[in-house]
């Protein structure tokens, strides 16, 4: 497995997390999860994180000689049926946490989990195991201040998941988290996340990455499976759509998202809808 050494001077996630704005709630059971109306319109897309205590009969393998203490499943809310059939086979107990992505960049992060992700952890992976254990203990034995504690633990666990996926990129799954594992591409992505309204072009983004235009464009496309221009359009459309949904005027939405005028944002939204048909 490839392990990426993180550059502590480059914060790859804070601007993204601010744009995603996750809100966490514990779902008490799979029955409750299945009772949710997935057909109703949802402004905020949702992920589900499932913490599992592995049964003592878990079988070690050459690839996993030391049985993991916990596992973590994360996927779309609509994947819950898959989750039931997959996880109940080998676990004793599950805790389901719903992460509503209330920020404008929520749909972009949802794309990263179009395929459910399984993570096996042990006590050495403290960024994941500590908040998972804390949540398990709190749900099993509630104490005063539980809602605040679960919110904070959910935040810590979610950040730990993203850090883990950025530090352990899957070469077969290009996308945002995979691209953030490359420090050069990450610099350009962070710049776009922090200032989407800036007049970005290929030259400016390549300069942020410290690469030539050609090398940057090629590396970005390989890591993201889309061009820098396409990602910037997707980012700005997400910001514009959320601004309009929240009641802002087209002029305000254009300013927030980086479009030069209301006519530009109207054309972009119309073009995006037409392309999806």
Q: Where are each of the predicted segments found?
A:
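An amphipathic alpha-helical interaction segment
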Residues: 115, 120-190
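Basic/polar phosphate-binding segments, predominantly the helix-turn-helix DNA-binding elements
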Residues: 166, 187, 193-194, 198-235, ...
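Hydrophobic recognition helices of helix-based DNA-binding modules
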Residues: 139, 161-165, 220, 244, ...
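A short, Lys/Arg-enriched amphipathic alpha-helix from helix-turn-helix/homeodomain DNA-binding modules
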Residues: 125-129, 154, 172-200, 207-209, ...
